[in-house]
Structure formats: C-alpha cells, structure tokens
Amino acid sequence: MKKIALIIVLVLAFTSCKEEPINPDRFKYGTFEIPEGKGYEKTIIVRQDSIQIETYEDRIDTLSISWKNNFNYTLKMINPKTAIDEDPIHIKITNIDKDSYDFEAVIGHSNYVQKGKLIKKSN
C-alpha cells in the first residue's frame, strides 16, 4: 500500500512540475518595444491583424506583416519613402523567452544581418 501511495505522489510531482510550452502566437498581436541599441533609438511597435505600426525618433511607419510560420515573417512598408523602404524586411525569431524574443533581420537580399530583441509590453 505504501508503494502505491509513493508511486502516486511521484507521478503527481512530476506531472505538476511540467512547464508549459512557450507559445509564439502571443507575439502576433499587441504592443512591443525594441530597446535602444547601438545606432538606433527605442522603437514602439503595435501589431493588429496584418498591420504593424512602428514609432521611433519622432517618426511613424506602417508596415504589412506576413507570417510564414511562428518563427519567420516579412515586413513591407505600406508607403515607402525611399528605395530601401521598398525592400521587404525578413525576420527570423531565434530565441523565445517568456515576454520577449531575439531576432535576426535582413533587408531585401542583403548579406547584412541586424540582431535585436523585441519585448512584449501589453496585449
């Protein structure tokens, strides 16, 4: 009888300690921040449906967002002002934490990879 009770306790202990998987879908909507970094100011991002609005350095840009899967998406300026604004920005999520993710961004077909962190502030 003691063995059965011990087995039940152990099973309950192991199943209750199971960590919930991190769901990347929560990064598809809400308000986010990219902290200030070397060469760029803090950026505030609001995502709704297929639109992303970015506010930085007293500028506001509106981009369409197209998700390839939970870890890759493409941004495209809706009203490009320069030739470089016409190129799509390909984003790859490289690591997910509780309320943030690390990413790599490539503009167009460039070989330059910009790395950064996006932090979720609210839904």
Predicted regions and their residues:
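Hydrophobic/aromatic beta-strand elements that line small-molecule binding cavities or substrate pockets
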Residues: 43-45, 62-66, 88-94, 116-120
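Tryptophan-anchored aromatic micro-motifs
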Residues: 24-39
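Positively charged n-region of N-terminal signal peptides that target proteins for export
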Residues: 1-4
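An anionic, turn-rich surface loop/hairpin at beta-sheet edges
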Residues: 75-98
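C-terminal motif of bacterial Sec signal peptides marking the signal peptidase cleavage site
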Residues: 13-16
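Bacterial signal peptide processing site
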Residues: 18-20
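Edge beta-strand at a domain terminus
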Residues: 108-123
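N-terminal glycine/threonine-rich, aromatic-flanked beta-hairpin/loop signature
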Residues: 40-68
